[in-house]
Amino acid sequence: INNLKSRNFEDYFMRNHYIFKNHLSIIRKCYRMFARMITMKITSKDIILDTDERIRMQSEPVQLPLSNEDRELLQAMLDYVRNSQDDEIAEAEDLQPAVGIAAVQVGVLKQMIAVVIPYEDGVDEVALVNPKIISESVQNAYLDNGEGCLSVKGEHPGHVFRHARIKVRGYDLIQDKNVTISAEGYFAICLQHEIDHLSGTLFYDHIDANNPWKSDDEAEVI
């Protein structure tokens, strides 16, 4: 500061510009480093409910290749579902247990879903962009105790009939390529539940209001 007082600022800057330039370069490098460290996180507070009009809106197709923003969001969705199934992490980060999530559930109207189904000997997990059901079985399946949803707080008891087997086409973030997935049973039900969100459909829309617990002798009960 004393030097600035004793000489012309322009002359001072011209003599020492390399110092400023070097400092600016360091600042930029630090910013990029911290930007990579700071990743998007989703908590239960980010989940919108069925009282929010956006949950009933149509989600838009996502342009490929994915932008950094879309990639980060889908990864955050996948991380939410994975972490919600870990009791310690779920409690520490305030996560509701989940097996799937759609982008619209965090207020983003884009065709993206994440599903994670753990088994004793492995896991079925996908993070899909623009998922589309391309074939489905005639046979139905349903969860014996009914379905639930992160965006639904009220009670909606009843059976939700879905296709027992489906094939889904889309881009999978985990494999970083376009895929065709064959799913059956619980995995198929969860995929259909999340894909429904992309058209503004909720699980209780499928429940028969007059006979919510009706059964189907030919359907697979899960």
Task: List each language-model region with its residue ranges.
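Positively charged
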Residues: I27-I222
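Short hydrophobic targeting helices and cationic amphipathic motifs
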Residues: L4, F9-F13, H17-L24
